[in-house]
Every structure is written in C-alpha cells, then in structure tokens.
Amino acid sequence: MARGADGGDGASVWQHVFLLPEYLKDDSKKMKSGLVFVKLANPCSGEGTIYLFNMCLPQLFEIKVFKEKNHSWFINESVQSGGLLHFATPVDPLFLLLHYLIKADKESFQGKFQPLDQVVMDDMFPDCILLLKLPELEKLLQHVTEEKEVDKKKYYKYSKEKTLKWLGKKVNQTMAALKTNKVNVSARVQSTAFFSGGQVSSDKDEDYVRYAHGLISDYIPKQLSDDLSKYLKLPEPPASVRNPPSKKAKLSDEPVMAKEDYTKFNSKDFKTVKKNSKMTAAQKALAKVDKSGMKSIDSFFGTKHVKKK
C-alpha cells in the first residue's frame, strides 16, 4: 500500500512532487481549473495516458517520471516514500491529433474529407475534444492534412505525404538541438549512455539522424515510424544496435499511464527486516545503548498533540 502522512483519522495522504514551468503557477491562480489532468490516447501506442492541460493558454504537457530506488521526500511534516519526481514538459499537440486523423483515414472515412469535430471523437477518451481548443489549430493541421472549405466550413483529410515532410523537419530540428547541446549520439545509439561533450567529434550525421528518428518515433505509430525511416533513407542498423542495453538515465521514457498504481514504484517497506539477517558488530553495540529519553525520528513527523490544561 502507498504510505503517506497521517491525516489524523488514520487515513494516508499520498502526494506527488512535480516540476512545472514557472508561468503555470500564475495560470493556476487565474482559473480554479487552470491546470487539469486529462486522460488521452497515447499517439504511439493508442493506450490511455495522463497529460496535463493548461486551460488558460491552452497548452498540453506530457508527464515524465524520474525514479530512483530508496528515495523519499520530506513534505511539510510528513515523509513521502518512493521519491518520484514528475516533470511536465510541453508536447506538440499535433502528434495527438495525428492519431485520430490516421485512425479516421483507415477505419471510418477512408480518404474522405470530414469536419475536425467528427474526426477527433473518442468514447474511451472524451477529453480529446480539448485538443480542438488549442490555439492556431488550423495552422497546425496544414502540416499533416489536405483541406477543403465549403460554405465557410473547413473539412480535412489525412495526408501521408505532408506528414512525412513535417516529421522530416522535426527530425532535423531534433538533430540541431542534439548538436547544439553536444550530446554524444554515437555512444547512445550503441549503449544509450551519456558521455562527455568532448567525444562528440566522433559522431556521424547518420547517428544523429538515427537517434533523432528514435526520439520522434516515441510520438507516432510504429507503421508511420517505419515509413519515416524509409523517407529519411536510413539503412538497417547493425545487429549489435538492434537490441541495445537498458538506458542508464533514470528519467523514464514511458508515459504515465492512465489509472496507474503509483505504489508499484515504491521501494519495499523500509521497516521490514529480514528474519534471518545477522546483526553487525556496530548494530550490537547500538542495541546496548541506553535509549531512555531519546526520540524516534518518526515522532518529528507525527500528529501534534495539544496538552490538556
């Protein structure tokens, strides 16, 4: 079970720690529901994923989790186990819209022009209609759709050709960012580990393209990722690269899934002691110490008691 601060009535309060852009703090004060968590279809897998939606701008954020074992947070007068750190970073909403455009093109309308509000519909994830409130939506759609206007109403149809061109630009932008920040992509393609910026000179353009393609592929369906690979004319990776070892970075690449049980990330109860474990010499010496008058660290985080007069 999740452990948290004692609420006074025996109930545990589970809390999460987030890092957010500074301006979101002001937006949350302007509207009571300025920041809301929404469940939307993941553009890569199609599964339900939790996103953060800023109702003021509006703006969409994805959530990543930094996790390490045996870490906890001190929050006010409570200790929060697990030590998870959540990051909310802006995500291009066109990736999520693309999910519905491709789906409509394959299943429902099969190449027909349709109004957007009939394309972005989802009984499983009804909050998807929030995507229609995003600013400059029509300008975004020009990158991935063909457009027609009838009686001052616009109709859209998915365009694979335009989409690949747009994704190609995304790959180039990602490559530029990697080079600017001197990320050693050759090493990351091989082992997904970070190396010093001094080693960047050994990187090849193909490695940058391949790594950038991998990053973009986290936001598109696999079939489209394969099509993008062909569009970029990427050769098949060598056998040693196809199954690289696990990433050393602690920032999870997996999205925060909807209705996820956060307790699975928690470390085991640190109060549990192995029955057959032997005491060290230091532990034996500590056991002999007179502890009368000493306070447990737990006493500093428990509920305050008011003395009766």
From Swiss-Prot:
Disulfide bonds: none
Residues recorded with modification N6-acetyllysine: 295
Keyword Acetylation among UniProt keywords: yes
Annotated coiled-coil segments of the chain: none
Entry-annotated residues carrying Phosphoserine: 296
CDD domains in UniProt: RNase_H2-B (cd09270)
Main localisation: nucleus
Residues the record lists as N-acetylalanine modifications: 2
One GO BP annotation of this record: regulation of G2/M transition of mitotic cell cycle
GO terms for cellular component: nucleoplasm; ribonuclease H2 complex
Record's keyword terms, sorted: Acetylation, Nucleus, Phosphoprotein
Cellular compartments annotated: Nucleus
Task of the protein: Non catalytic subunit of RNase H2, an endonuclease that specifically degrades the RNA of RNA:DNA hybrids. Participates in DNA replication, possibly by mediating the removal of lagging-strand Okazaki fragment RNA primers during DNA replication. Mediates the excision of single ribonucleotides from DNA:RNA duplexes.
Binding partners and assembly: The RNase H2 complex is a heterotrimer composed of the catalytic subunit RNASEH2A and the non-catalytic subunits RNASEH2B and RNASEH2C.
Family: Belongs to the RNase H2 subunit B family.
Protein known as: Ribonuclease H2 subunit B
Primary gene name: RNASEH2B
